[in-house]
From Swiss-Prot:
The active site is at 96 (nucleophile), 422, 473, 482. Disulfide bonds: none annotated. This is Endoglucanase 1. Belongs to the glycosyl hydrolase 9 (cellulase E) family. It is an enzyme of class 3 (hydrolase). GO terms for cellular component: extracellular region.
Length: 501
């Protein structure tokens, strides 16, 4: 460890090593703004099971015999036919009937990362989590089966959003959109490469043939992403914006994809790529949020392990960048904002996605630091792995009900949770109960009603409360009441860790 610390940092570390159980200590540290909300201990194991079950409610395609979310039925069975390709399967991203490839790929990467770091703690839920990943990767393999072409979206978002109908009934156009060498999409291609590479690690031991198939496709897709550079939203703006525009550009996905291929292959080609292109791809730009759009922070945490554990000294800067992110989200930091009740708050719409992704990164980085027997540095202060775990736990506890409203923001967990989530399938009677088709506009009578959703989308985590810890539980409030796959994906890893501990 001392080999990679400056003398001043080594002294700082030795001075603070006895603080490992208490975390952040500094004369300049600020008092916590968190309020305590007394609740019984959370059942993280139950929450983990439900967080994985949620993905079955988002499935598109022909459902398997072991489908547990039984109010759902087959849907989207002709997806891809508009361009004579098979794009059946995959996930609906949130509460609509769209298949957006960009967030689906990120969801897949984060589910895979959750299993890579904490899958050994999942026990009986591990097969279900692998099924959730495979449902996505099977689709991503279809979407990348043609050379130098990626099918990135199924459905017309504007027409889809003008209807309120079950996925089993949808009659809106299932338009297919793609990127190719003439209309590149380095961002979505880089994310798909990351997803396939990460998933290849998950299946390496249990299904070597499938794992190798995923990895070889990841290599091909990354080559396409790097060779034909450009953001996918440049050529597909009317179709993907403002829903999933690539606001942060494509550079972060190239770094992210290379980082995952480095991890999956251990091929020096990708390490050399990162060394040569890291600065150009924004490795040292300051970011303090991690999401389906911006992967810089995730790449830094992932690459920091190469320095911390594998002792790749040329990647030391990624440990420093990872520390900078950690420092930026600590309660009391000038760049962090927390609600009066203690929830990390990044923005008004779908804030829980940042809560779950940050919590996962804190726990993952704590794992790396512990393995390397070191700490994070915030100026002259030390932040221990224990401190990072404590912050992450408080965020997850808030999500599960440790908040001023005593409300769980996970559907089906606890006694008080959102009952009117912004989700078409959940808010309309199931096909089994109401076999007659519900037409495009007919569903809006239920959309505007105050009745609870007839089908619980168990495990779904909604966008969450506002900056004052308030949550109206209104179906029309999509920013706070809509679930999404990329909210749940990193939470799976966090809950796996907490369930064990």
């Amino acid at each position: 460890m001392a080999l990679y610390l400056s003398s001043s940092r080594l002294i700082t570390f030795l001075s603070f090593i006895l603080l490992l159980s208490n975390g952040f200590s500094s004369s300049s540290s600020r008092p916590s703004i968190h309020h305590r909300h007394h609740l019984d201990n959370h059942n993280y194991k139950d929450a983990l099971s439900k967080s994985i079950l949620f993905f079955e409610g988002q499935r598109s395609g022909k459902l398997p015999p072991n489908q547990r979310m039984t109010w759902r039925s087959n849907s989207g069975l002709s997806d891809g036919s508009a361009l004579n390709v098979d794009l059946v399967g995959g996930y609906y991203d949130a509460g609509d009937n769209m298949k957006f490839g960009f967030p689906m790929a990120f969801t897949t990467t984060m589910l895979s990362w959750s299993l890579i770091e904490f899958g050994g703690l999942m026990k009986s839920e591990l097969p279900n989590a692998k099924d959730a990943i495979r449902w996505a990767t099977d689709f991503l393999l279809k979407a990348t089966s043609h050379p130098d072409t990626i099918y990135v979206q199924v459905g017309d978002p504007n027409m889809d959003h003008a209807c309120w109908e079950r996925p089993e009934d949808m009659d809106t156009p299932r338009s297919v959109f793609k990127v190719d060498k003439n209309n590149p999409g380095s961002d979505i291609a880089g994310e798909i490469a990351a997803a396939l590479a990460a998933a290849s690690i998950v299946f390496r031991k249990c299904d070597p043939s499938y794992s190798n198939h995923l990895l070889q496709r990841a290599i091909t897709v990354f080559t396409f992403a790097d060779k034909y550079r450009g953001p996918y939203s440049a050529g597909l703006a009317p179709e993907v914006c403002p829903f999933y525009c690539s606001y942060s550009g494509y550079q972060d996905e190239l770094l992210w994809g290379a980082a995952w291929l480095q991890k999956a292959t251990n091929n020096p080609t990708y390490l050399n790529y990162i060394k040569a292109n890291g600065q150009i791809l924004g490795a040292d730009e300051f970011d303090n949020m991690f999401s389906w759009d911006n992967k810089h922070v995730g790449a830094r945490i992932l690459l920091s392990k190469e320095f911390l554990i594998q002792k790749v000294k040329s990647l030391e800067e990624y440990k420093e960048h990872a520390d900078s992110f950690i420092c930026s989200v600590l309660p009391g930091a000038s760049s962090s904002q927390y609600t009066p009740g203690g929830l990390l708050f990044k923005m008004g719409e779908s804030n829980m996605q940042y809560v779950t992704s940050t919590s996962f990164l804190l726990l993952t980085y704590a794992k790396y630091l512990t393995s390397a027997r070191t700490v994070a540095y915030c100026g002259g202060s030390v932040v221990t792995p224990a401190r990072l775990r404590s912050i992450a736990k408080k965020q997850v506890d808030y999500l599960l009900g440790g908040n001023p409203l005593k409300m769980s923001y996970m559907v089906g967990y606890g006694l008080k949770y959102p009952r009117r989530i912004h989700h078409r399938g959940s808010s309309l009677p199931s096909v089994a109960v109401h076999p007659t088709r519900i037409q495009c506009h007919d569903g809006f009578s239920l959309f505007t009603s105050q009745s609870p959703n007839p089908n619980d989308l168990v495990g779904a985590v909604v966008g969450g409360p506002d900056q004052n810890d308030q949550f109206p539980d209104e179906r029309s409030d999509y920013g706070r009441s809509e679930p999404a796959t990329y909210i749940n994906a990193p939470l799976v890893g966090a809950l796996a860790y907490l369930a064990r501990s």
